[in-house]
Amino acid sequence: MSGMGENTSDPSRAETRKRKECPDQLGPSPKRSTEKRNREQENKYIEELAELIFANFNDIDNFNFKPDKCAILKETVKQIRQIKEQEKAAAANIDEVQKSDVSSTGQGVIDKDALGPMMLEALDGFFFVVNLEGNVVFVSENVTQYLRYNQEELMNKSVYSILHVGDHTEFVKNLLPKSMVNGGSWTGEPPRRNSHTFNCRMLVKPLPDSEEEGHDNQEAHQKYETMQCFAVSQPKSIKEEGEDKQSCLICVARRVPMKERPALPSSESFTTRQDLQGKITFLDTSTMRDAMKPGWEDLVRRCIQKFHTQHEGESLSYAKRHHHEVLRQGLAFSQIYRFSLSDGTLVAAQTKSKLIRSQTTNEPQLVISIHMLHREQNVCVMNPDLTGQAMGKPLSPMSSSSPARQAMCSGNPGQDVALGSNMNFPMNGPREQMSMPMGRFGGSGGMNHVSGMQATTPQGSNYALKMNSPSQSSPGLNPGQPSSVLSPRHRMSPGVAGSPRVPPSQFSPAGSLHSPAGVCSSTGNSHSYTNSSLNALQALSEGHGVSLGPSLASPDLKMGNSQNSPVNMNPPPLSKMGSLDSKDCFGLYGEPSEGTTGQAQASCHPEEQKRPNDSSMPQAASEDRAEGHSRLHESKGQTKLLQLLTTKSDQMEPSPLPSSLSDTNKDSTGSLPGPGSTHGTSLKEKHKILHRLLQDSSSPVDLAKLTAEATGKELNQESSGTAPGSEVTVKQEPASPKKKENALLRYLLDKDDTKDIGLPEITPKLERLDSKTDPASNTKLIAMKTVKEEVSFEPSDQPGSELDNLEEILDDLQNSQLPQLFPDTRPGAPTGSVDKQAIINDLMQLTADSSPVTPVGAQKAALRMSQSTFNNPRPGQLGRLLPNQNLPLDITLQSPTGAGPFPPIRNSSPYSVIPQPGMMGNQGMLGSQGNLGNNSTGMIGSSTSRSSMPSGEWAPQSPAVRVTCAATTGAMNRPIQGGMIRNPTASIPMRANSQPGQRQMLQPQVMNIGPSELEMNMGGPQYNQQQAPPNQTAPWPESILPIDQASFGSQNRHPFGSSPDDLLCPHPAAESPSDEGALLDQLYLALRNFDGLEEIDRALGIPELVSQSQAVDPEQFSSQESSMMLEQKPPVFPQQYASQTQMAQGSYNPMQDPNFHTMGQRPNYTTLRMQPRPGLRPTGIVQNQPNQLRLQLQHRLQAQQNRQPLMNQISGVSNVNLTLRPGVPTQAPINAQMLAQRQREILNQHLRQRQMHQQQQVQQRTLMMRGQGLNMTPSMVAPTGLPAAMSNPRIPQANAQQFPFPPNYGISQQPDPGFTGATTPQSPLMSPRMAHTQSPMMQQSQANPAYQPASDINGWAQGSMGGNSMFSQQSPPHFGQQANTSMYNNNMNINVSMATNTAGLSNMNQMTGQMSMTSVTSVPTSGLSSMGPEQVNDPALRGSSLFTTNQLPGMDMIKQEGDGSRKYC
């Protein structure tokens, strides 16, 4: 600098001056008196020199005293000498350095002119200079990278135009510092130098296309970037030198590193002014705008909405109540209220208001309010799911163990928990989630009950995770994550609770619950039911006594953290509840040992209790309980709706705890556990029901009353224990009066409904019907529930007025139509609660004994159940009731069979368990459909199978899958109507084939619905995918196949596919054959009644589905269904599921007959069965039938030959049954006994075959390996591996191998067990998929071509190409992505086909469903066209290159299908 130059230009002079001036500087000197001015200026230069010298050194900071001029000058001279020496050395070495190509290390190497630009480029920020007027004198070009402004745009522009208004003062302080240079720097003040570092917010230029404006106009224009500025003031000495420069601030600005960014304050506030009527006249959000926290506008909006919205169960909104207090007291604080932001963040808010009076007249003029907001951290966004078991604890603290805590956190923790529960529940998968998370949730009592399911917890957890993760939000499992999942919204209101999954509205239950639940006003209660169920489940898992009471307890409790943990907080809430549930709560856990009778009672009573809780309007439910007794008969229709809302969870809950929780349910939320699992399914349904209730009822109070009636009726009827609940509810009812909330609630409901799309609407309506049935039977057993369901239909028969009311309320549901479809169901149901209980007891006995003979009542109940199930598949009641019922059944069975209630068998196979909770319900549906006769027993049998087949977890898994299917079906039941209608064409042929065909038809329909339902709930793909991996690990290929099927179709479908057959195989024996025949007949009638179905669909608002159902093309139906499902829940599982259903179906559609498509793809299970019969028949019916007969014969022969006990046996049995059934479509007369015998024979055969196949698989593998090496035709390899397939392969060996599989219908059954067996034994991972494949070798040689035609034929073909028969299948060539998945994909696709023939058929499906491509492949043989011929015709396929990709040409669609399956896998 000039100063430095002056002082140091002459070192000798400087030294001299220093020596001479040192003494003088220490004190005044007369000699210098005349040079005072020069001295002052010299001092300035010295100070500046000191700063320059020490600028790059910290030495100055080490001085404890101000360094004197002598020291400063001495240091200056020292540094100048060093610099000169370095420059000399650099100059001396520069030539050598450059010659040696070594970068110079001398400081003087960099050119002075280049240094500046280089430094600017290296800057982690931009450089700008501001003059005293605040104008930007210079800014570097890279400012565009930070603020999107061009250099020209900022030059000569006021810096304050880009600075946040809140930072102007700070910037001015730095721009105009107190004289830092004129002697003030030595005062000891911290800023000794004129350099400073400070943070400021700079405006980021809005995008030119206003992309951001679309999101938030204001925020888009006011987006600020926090910059860290290092500023240096231009030395005044320059100006004093006479230069024409102004003092300026030189700054380097960079983004503040995340780690250095100060944590944004969690508290925010904004101010409003209201007139004396409480209307907002002014809104000041400047403080929040200045804070620049993301989402502040949404925060303000939602806060005002929450504050001024009237909530159900409350006469006044927070704002009105607070306004009255302010006018009365002059100053008031509102209670803390909570809500959630669009991103799910929970916010706790409190408003402080003051009345402002005129200074002159002292008259009140206005009210000023400060709204203080605190954002709560998202504690468990998706982690609870992921943490699964850990979740139990988190949930326990947050949601399950202490809804009260939740309540404390959110005020409506119950809601939140319920939400989480609901979220789980919303997807059938979530139900499974619940089951697995239950353990995880600990609070998922129902799931815990389904501990066996919990065995599936790993799977379930996976499922749950997947389900949740999408969910997303998966708030499904999020009960444990009350904060995030149970967004404040959830907590805030029952409706809010509904939003955990998709924070507010994915399941609209939140919104809808918000409204309806709000109507009940036990925000917590509405979710309370869910919450209760969750709490109960959690408490159960934790061993705590959870009381629905708290949730049920009054909304007051809920509001005031009344949802105190159902477990821990129970007593207080119960106290508030008036001990409504306190007994029940603890009774729930205290009296779990009561007998089944107690259970039945508990089922009813807990249902009643839980219904209120479960219902979105728990409070109203509770209140209505008290009033419900008197008013119960006044509006039974709406009561039914409310019961639906309340019972669905209840049904689920009781089912999980048939024995141990029977009393718990009775006394407490014993039924809660069930709701946890059913929440996902019932949430939407309830949401729809609530929506309808809102429409039907004039006010929340009415809803509350209705709820009371709905819950009170059953509750009061079933047990007096609910009376306290009634009281509590009654307490809440006063709060219910809020009618203003109706508009908002309706809006929310409508809004959420939109999200639910068509299916949810269907579901609620159906669900309402289900509710009717549910209230009566909260029993654990599906049969009981079904019976109740029937009862609900019965009510139609019994109390015509009630039915009429219900029909009126549920016009869309067309209650009358459902009964018409299933007249038997109603007649069966006419029995009162006593009959229901009797039926329940019978079912319990069936479950416990799993004896083929069931009480007539039980059988009727089962029949009704199947009918009802079938009837109500659309309602989704099955999904809920059946799932719940199924769960109870499975649980019960497992409890009896496996020492553990459910864990023994289910735990052995995590999938088994999970599929059971979620899939069991479906199983119930499918079982009831597939095993209509065996419905209850089938379910039980399924459970029993699980219990008996702990090692073959997959077999139980089949049932589990079935359960899932049933649950899904229940959830899907709504779609099922449409699906049934859609698939009637496909299903009709099936029916034509045989009763099994009917079953198949139902199952495909259910399956079709299942995917959509799953998608709606959680998305089948997630579960599917999760299932697939577990399948890989599972040693039970066929069971796995069903699971895959479920994954493909939607876990639920699997169960349909395989579980119905499995159930039929074992269950026909266990169950009186008459039931199966009757159920089949009923199913046939119901399915045949397309008009009724169509009407129901129309009532459900599914004209599209109806039209689709009318369409004869199953392809369309399946694809449409999948599409619809995807549309309904595309976000949840659109890709996976859509691709699976659409792609797989689409692929199948082109590849297979439409029938095949419909049945094979969507209904995987049914499809395969149907397809081989109807599907193949249309294409090559003649061949298929003979093939079927041949296959049947082969199956028997092979079964005898190959007696290998394999889980696939069950699948195989079902396959055989399917085969037999398809083979015996004309054998419809065959009674259940005959079928049972056949099934037994088939099972034995399959056992033998599988043993043989296992042995053969090794051989086949070796042969396949050799064959692959030799390109042996599958037939060449098949002979060893495919005794049954051999016959078909014999037809066209290369093609025959493929074709045999189309004919392989039977062969597939034969080989299926063998393949399955071989596959299963060969590799657990492979076995899940390979099970279908049969043996990798077989698959490659035979199955491969067949498989290739099958859904994943290409994948399989490539897999075969892989070389390892087993691993080649696994090899991802076709499934590329999924080496293991390829098995799963194949399995899945195969499952699609396999789904129908779970074991044998699953393999068969491999072969037939394999695409009917196999059949197609065998098209030349069988006449199946499309894929098959292409593949078969493909020389590569026919030739030794069975495994070559040449098979792919005809298999492209299959490959797509496979890909789709992969997605699901």
UniProtKB/Swiss-Prot annotation:
Region (CASP8AP2-binding): 691-743
Source superkingdom: Eukaryota
Modified residue annotations for Omega-N-methylarginine: 1261
Position of the Glycyl lysine isopeptide (Lys-Gly) (interchain with G-Cter in SUMO2) cross-link: 239, 648, 705, 731, 785, 1455
Comp. bias (Low complexity): 638-648
Motif LXXLL motif 3 positions after renumbering to this chain: 745-749
Modified residues (N6-acetyllysine): 636, 640, 780, 785
Motif (LXXLL motif 4): 878-882
Record comment regarding domains: Contains four Leu-Xaa-Xaa-Leu-Leu (LXXLL) motifs. The LXXLL motifs are essential for the association with nuclear receptors and are, at least in part, functionally redundant.
Assembly with partners or alone: Present in a complex containing NCOA3, IKKA, IKKB, IKBKG and CREBBP. Present in a complex containing CARM1 and EP300/P300. Interacts (via C-terminus) with CREBBP. Interacts (via LXXLL 1, 2 and 3 motifs) with RORA (via AF-2 motif). Interacts (via LXXLL 1, 2 and 3 motifs) with RORC (via AF-2 motif). Interacts with APEX1. Interacts with BMAL1. Interacts with CARM1. Interacts with CASP8AP2. Interacts with CLOCK. Interacts with DDX5. Interacts with ESR1. Interacts with HIF1A. Interacts with NCOA1. Interacts with NR4A1/Nur77. Interacts with NR4A3; potentiates the activity of the NR4A3.
Name of the molecule in the record: Nuclear receptor coactivator 2
Gene behind this protein: Ncoa2
